Amino acid sequence: MINEDIIYEYEHNNRIVIIGDIHGDIRRFKDILIDAKIINKNIEWIAEPKNTIVVQMGDQVDSINRDRTLEDWEVLPDIEMIYFTNLLHKIALSKGGRVISLIGNHELMNTIGNYSYVSPKSLNNNYKRQELFKPSGTLSAILSQRPLVVKIGQLLFCHAGLTLRHLDILSKYNKDVSYINTIWKNFIKNNAILAEDKEIFEDIILDGDGMLWTRDLDKKGDLIKMLEKLGCVYMFVGHSVVEQVKLINDHVWYTDTGISRAFGNTSYQYIDIFNNQINIKDVLA
């Protein structure tokens, strides 16, 4: 296991590949990585430049078909996505790169015992699922290293989206955005949530308008204020499915194009940023 604190901020990087919600579809995830020339079919890191960063926007698990008429496509249980991205991060680090897997609302749901989107193949039984995902459980060593929010240069990444209200809550307690990652790490390692952290945990992480759940981001004026406070130009989010990657209010990129076969799509997209140029890439199933 890679033993490091959760890193919030990275320097500007010449190449960042951004992949939306995966929901257990390890095959399509690999297809994107191969299409982007991040790995080859032998899972070797071939990215150029070598220090390329891959950001996966969360929701690696919960692979139940959203349309029950879809054929069963799942070969491996959804947790294999967590293990694979953990392995890939180790491979990337050995070559100078990095794979950042964000925490999404579906990872959180599983840690609190909500398995309503888990496929029959992945569920196996409730007890085993609980032992995997519970705080201090089997997966906690991996999940405790994964951030809820990351900044790379002037780019902000989180699963559903940060708002000015979230920053105001943090400011009330003299905390910066990186503290959200600290609270998550304490929670998943089964450390007590401090009394002064309770509002941050409940309103920013657990709440339906929190950064893992919201579908109602700030209007443009407040969005710009929020980004300026963090020294950012763009925010990248997953969570809300869109037919194609799109830019909203000039500052928010929506990246979740329903990649997983659980959504029944025959094409999907990812983002490849190279030398500050944001490129939207199409993949046909």
Residue ranges and their predicted role:
Residues 1-285:
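Feature recognizes metal-dependent phosphohydrolase scaffolds
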